[in-house]
Amino acid sequence: MTPAEMLLSLIRGPKVYAYIRRHNTVFPSNSLEYVSETMLTVMNGCYTVCSVVSPFLLLIAYNRSLLNGTNFMMLAKFTVTYYVIAISMRTIGRIFNPEYRRFADTLFKAHLHGHNASSLLVGYDYELFAAPIDFRARKESRKYFETPRRFTATGNILYTALRDRLSYNIAYSFARVLVYPGSAALLNKLIQSFLIENRRKLVIEKGAMRGVLMTREGNRVDSMFVDRREQGENGDILVVTCEGNAGFYETGIMPTPLTLNYSVLGWNQPGFGESSGLPTPKQTVASIDAVIQYAIHKLGFEEEQIVIYAWSIGGFPATWAAANYPNIKAKMPRSWAPLVEFIVRTYFDMPIAMQLTAYNGPLVLIRRTQDEMIITTEGTSEERLATNRANNLLKSILRARHPNLINDDDAELAVDVWLAATPLERISLTKDCPKTLAMGNIENLTKQNRNILIHCLCSKYLVDFDSSHNTPLDLSLFTIPSSF
């Protein structure tokens, strides 16, 4: 590496969080590095806050006549000077830090010799924006789903333009953080040390391999793979986890399949942890597409060996993957109201039911009976359970897979009866359930036998877990569904 290349690496290089495989995991830094990193963190935090409240700041600035060229120039000069000072201090600090110079040299060599990148950098945990790419997703034809919208352009051009601009600002300033709190810069900063320590444990204790994937959108996906193929029959099955709206693979649902000795591939959604981008529907499906391609083309798993295990809003990328990879082994899964609906349908449209009905393979839904997040009515426990959104998913699956059976109000009522039943009542409802679900003579079934068959199908597609939204899944419920 030439002196010029080294200097450029020190200026643009990523922050190193920690050593992974050393007894002392703390990566050394000097006072100049600490002060400069603090300056950059403060400025980035100010930028994030200002972005969130930008509509109000602009309104205040306009009312006080602050939106003029002189003030813009002063703000630009201050920002540029601030960043130049911070980056210069950081660069000087890195010049006097032999450990960072060693890391910069390792990173430079890793980019020159891509096939050795993982082995060269495996000892460091650092910002992944500068990491070599382990896998690039291919651009292939995919299915995309969109909920039908009732919002169209109106004759009032001014109203439409105002609505679109206002909704865009709300969606990408604070609505995104409400839908996906895991993408909030503040939350990522607060739990950063916890994520770093858990990544180290996955590598050291579980033998995990970290992978950096490039999506067709140009985002980087931070992934972690634990290979158990040499450790028993379950290891030949790869469980791809899809976390919730505040979940990370470092702290999420990976432990459940790992405890049962499955191979596991975890990944972070766009904007979560070290994954780049924003958690919009388009970028999210591009990320899960890259993850599945990585599992097939790089890790060597067949599509039939892959199981998708999703939690909460992770059902959106999970159902998209199921719809686009049909051979996977299994899927587990007022005044402002018009504006809110328009924002969600336009910027955060996640048609989980539509995507799930496009998948015809084996699956099981796990309904959390005490769930406080995915309900639409507060009230008694019976009222909350009746509005659990898992109920709607079950009905969508039944209508799509068994249209001759679920085709009227009586059939839907039979499903509702089963959904509201206690475990003992369900035993009674399904005691005469046929061992083989022969669907050929539905028209000739009596109403009683038809209801028995519906209850039997419900018991195959959905199981209850007596827990709230954030309780880890009980190991006894993590079973690979089979076709029937």
Protein language model regions, located:
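Cap/lid segment of the alpha/beta-hydrolase catalytic domain
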Residues: 254-255, 266-285
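A conserved short beta-strand
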Residues: 326-331
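Alpha/beta-hydrolase active-site loop
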Residues: 278-300
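Active-site signature of alpha/beta-hydrolase-fold catalytic machinery across serine-
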Residues: 320-324
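N-terminal targeting or regulatory segments adjacent to alpha/beta-hydrolase or S9 domains
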Residues: 1-199, 474-484
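Short, surface-exposed "cap/lid" segments of acyl-processing enzymes
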Residues: 67, 95, 99-104, 161, ...
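The feature captures the conserved acid-bearing segment of alpha/beta-hydrolase catalytic domains
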Residues: 332-438, 442, 450
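Gly/Ala-rich beta-loop-alpha elbow adjacent to hydrolase catalytic centers
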Residues: 309-318
